[in-house]
Every structure is written in C-alpha cells, then in structure tokens.
UniProtKB/Swiss-Prot annotation:
It comes from Photobacterium profundum (strain SS9). It is an enzyme of class 3 (hydrolase). The active site is at 240. Pfam families: IU_nuc_hydro. InterPro entries: I/U_nuclsd_hydro_CS, Inosine/uridine_hydrolase_dom, IUNH, Pyrim_hydro_RihA, Ribo_hydro-like. This is Pyrimidine-specific ribonucleoside hydrolase RihA.
C-alpha cells in the first residue's frame, strides 16, 4: 500500500527536487500538489510546480495555487537563492496542463473529505496554506495522518540569526500548525545542513543520463552558487526539502528526538524562531518529532537510485 500525501510547496530548487524524488517513489501516492508564495512570488511557484510535473510526466496530479501572501505580513521571497524564475539554471518544459480552478485549501479539503484513509501533508514552504486549511476545516483534522514539514531549526537560523526562512515568512501560520495537535515531523536546518550534496554527487547524477537526472544536476549546479559563500562553511549545498520525502521513504536514515516546539511571533530579534524544548524544561506537551541528523551518503544514494527510475 502506498502512502497518500499532499505536497504543499514553493518551488524553488530544493522543492523541485523533492517533487522529483516523490514522483519517482511508488511508495507514495501523491494526491495533489499545492503551491504557496515563498521562494518566489505565487504565480511563479505555481508555474514551476506545473513545469516540474510536466517534466516527470505526472500531469495526472491535480495542482492548485494557494495564498498570495502570508496571513498578516508582507511577502518575503528568496530570489537571491533561487533566481528570477525561482528555478534558474536548467531549461524546463512549459506546463502541459492547467492548474485546478480552485484555491489550494479547497483542493486539499476536497481530497481529505474523499480520502478513505488519513493523508500525510508535506509542506516544504511557508505554512500559510496549511494554517488556512486547519483553521477553516477543523472537521477534517482527523483525516490528516501527520504533517511532515521542512522548516525551523533548534539552533541558528538561515534568514535571520534566529529564524529559518519558511517559518520566518509566515510565523503566525507556523504557530497555528504547531498548536494544532496534529503529529508533526520537523525537518529543520539541524538535519538539512547535514544533508549536503557535493560536486562529485552532482556529477554522478549527471551521468545517470536521463532527462530528469540532467535537469536535477543543472538545478543543483545553480543551487550550489549561493551556498559556496564561505560564511556558511558548507562543503556542498544542503538539500532541505528532499529530506521530507527521504524521511517518508527511509526513516532509518535519520536520527530524531520528540519534544515540544513553539513559534516566536513577537520577538524583535527572534521573530520566526522555532523554540525547541529539547531538554523538557517546560511542561508543554510533546508535539513534534525533530530530525537532527542524517546518513548523508544513504540520503544521496536514495536520490540517485530514484532518479535512475526515470
């Protein structure tokens, strides 16, 4: 039995690779792809999701665009990381299909209503769409198996000293999600910064020599540019969003702890911080499985193995 999932994303190079990995994995039944603003503007992230699904031949998956901006803040985008299109680097096909004529939240609600078993939500961008779904469809919470998200950090941020980008873009949305009572797995910077892909890994992917692997290598070539800045101290580039899919496929590659996580929505220096109570210093109930380490080679091998399926 394959696991039913909905991917909510803001493509973005690493979102695109997460989509490619998921579509190559028969263990996952992708019920829908929804998009949010984040790495680029909402019209660009929607267009990019359609282009990636066209590339991998999955035009059967329903796609819908979601919120145009965060719940109560101005939109921040990461064009310094992902370029003008959001997927700068490779030449991608234009979409061979149209998005659904409805909002992302409406599409997710429809799928949850019709589902015969609980569905896993996999958000890899800001949590605006997920928060709107949870706030407006409380009757569907029981239809959600869990939320496996990329976001947050127990240590330092990557957009501010305290905050990771996805959470910082819409901290109020993240607050709703983490307070929802639905089981959460958090793939934050603690683990994704250990899930780095190196130059030699990219060359191995290029040598797989099918069209999807070629595009993946070219996506990674561009993604490397930003991460070569010495301030990060990286040997390669961290593949943030694919960690969510890899955890669903091979959780044994990861190490985790269970603890309470809260979202800072007020701090002048700490806005968007994920407060991780690793040592149970509060009485707050455990709400999150926090991933903090990964078998890097196993992770890269999984990606290469699935790319060969194309």
């Amino acid at each position: 039995m394959s696991r039913p999932i909905i991917i909510d994303c803001d493509p973005g190079h690493d979102d695109a690779i997460a989509l490619i990995l998921a579509c190559a994995s028969p263990e996952l039944d992708i019920k829908a792809v929804t998009t949010s603003a984040g790495n680029q503007t909402p019209e660009k992230t929607l267009h990019n999701a359609l282009r990636i699904l066209t590339l991998v031949g999955r035009t059967d998956i329903p796609v819908a665009g979601g919120a145009l901006q965060p719940l109560s803040r101005e939109l921040i985008i990461a064009d310094n990381v992902h370029g003008e299109t959001g997927l700068d680097g490779p030449v991608l096909p234009e979409p061979a299909f149209e998005p659904q004529p409805c909002h992302a939240v409406e599409l997710m609600a429809k799928i949850l209503t019709e589902a015969t078993e609980p569905v896993t939500l996999v958000p890899t961008g800001p949590l605006t769409n997920i928060a709107l779904l949870l706030a407006t469809h409380r009757e569907l919470h029981s239809q959600i198996d869990s939320i496996v998200l990329m976001g947050g950090s127990a240590e330092a941020g990557n957009w501010t000293p305290a905050a990771e980008f996805n959470i910082y873009v819409d901290p109020e949305a993240a607050d709703i999600v983490f307070k929802s009572g639905i089981p959460i797995t958090m793939c934050g910077l603690d683990v994704t910064h250990r899930a780095q892909i190196m130059d030699e890994d990219i060359e191995k992917i290029r040598k797989i020599n099918n069209p999807v692997a070629q595009v993946t290598a070219e996506l990674l070539d561009f993604f490397m540019i930003y991460h070569r800045d010495p301030k990060w101290g990286f040997e390669g580039a961290p593949l943030h969003d694919p960690c969510t899919i890899a955890w669903l496929l091979e959780p044994e590659l990861f190490a985790s702890i269970n603890c309470w996580v809260g979202i800072e929505t007020q701090g002048s220096h700490t806005l968007g911080m994920t407060v991780v109570d690793r040592y149970q210093l509060t009485d707050n109930p455990i709400n999150t499985t926090v991933l903090f380490d990964v078998n890097r080679q196993g992770f890269v091998d999984l990606l290469a193995e699935r790319l060969a399926n194309y």
